């Protein structure tokens, strides 16, 4: 129900930034949550957010200096009603519907 463009993040081991677009293919509004396999070297903003039906949301990833390594982020998503104001709420309630994995490569 969502796509991420670009689907992979490539960074120098000395650090770097990338911006990705989360695009919804759903007719419903979605909430998302981003989980990282390496919180020591990656910062992601936003961690929680919304994507409107057939809409887009921007995701910024910052790679801090560190050893070359392959990591990933997992973007979990769930349908939410239009009036939902807290993007964390569906995940606290265990409402995850699907997920997509984005590879992060530092070389």
Swiss-Prot record:
Organism: Caenorhabditis elegans
Annotated Pfam families: Motile_Sperm (PF00635)
Tissue-by-tissue expression: Expressed at higher level in testis.
Residue stretches making up the MSP domain: 1-107
Name the record gives this protein: Sperm-specific class P protein 34
Highest taxon above the source species: Eukaryota
Classification via SUPFAM superfamilies: PapD-like
Gene: ssp-34
Cross-referenced PROSITE patterns: MSP
Extent of Polar residues compositional bias: 15-25
